[in-house]
């Protein structure tokens, strides 16, 4: 999910080794419509295009990716991992402009969250439509009126493998619901009338083409790596 003041730009495309940030999976990528599987904190994860990493390493890189993309949350399917994991942050609301320069997002962080196998339970069923939503996988598209439960509890596992629970309301509750949706193959546009998605048809087609281009590059890189291994 994007921060309210976000102007996201794609991370540079570079495969191999341990990444500083991950390239973003975009609207149209089949992985964004898959239901993710559970994981444990002890798992080794393999983000396509990169070396295997621990769950903690992946979480750290996801946070770095999220900050670079000026987001407020990022789910594992958005980096090509079909596992039930997301990262999110709370930012300070009192951003001050300094001679026209954007305040670095990291300096505004109040709290970071890394959630494995999150389960959202609604506390207050009243729907809230007062916040604008966007998504790092659907860059440049924002909509008001996405209905979300006003208050939720999230039960999850932390990076040490311990069970945790947190209650959230208003915007943070929205973030947790948005990211958990990703783990079930849902996007925020799915909660809106079809004519709103149709209004964004031109932009969505452009994003889908960018997604196809990325997947083609990833496939070519993967073929090249397999060829190298076969000829060692």
Curated annotation (Swiss-Prot):
Cofactor: Fe(2+)
Catalytic EC class: hydrolase
UniProt keyword Iron, yes or no: yes
Gene3D superfamilies (alphabetical): Peptide deformylase
Catalysed reaction equations from the record: N-terminal N-formyl-L-methionyl-[peptide] + H2O = N-terminal L-methionyl-[peptide] + formate
Keywords: Hydrolase, Iron, Metal-binding, Protein biosynthesis
GO molecular function, one term: peptide deformylase activity
UniProt cross-references to CDD domains, sorted A to Z: Pep_deformylase
EC annotation from Swiss-Prot or TrEMBL: 3.5.1.88
BP terms from Gene Ontology: co-translational protein modification; translation
Residues of the signal peptide: none
Domain of life of the source: Bacteria
Sites where the protein binds Fe cation: 135, 178, 182
The record's free-text note on cofactor binding: Binds 1 Fe(2+) ion.
Catalytic center residues: 179
Similarity field: Belongs to the polypeptide deformylase family.
Role: Removes the formyl group from the N-terminal Met of newly synthesized proteins. Requires at least a dipeptide for an efficient rate of reaction. N-terminal L-methionine is a prerequisite for activity but the enzyme has broad specificity at other positions.
The protein's name: Peptide deformylase
Record organism: Deinococcus radiodurans (strain ATCC 13939 / DSM 20539 / JCM 16871 / CCUG 27074 / LMG 4051 / NBRC 15346 / NCIMB 9279 / VKM B-1422 / R1)
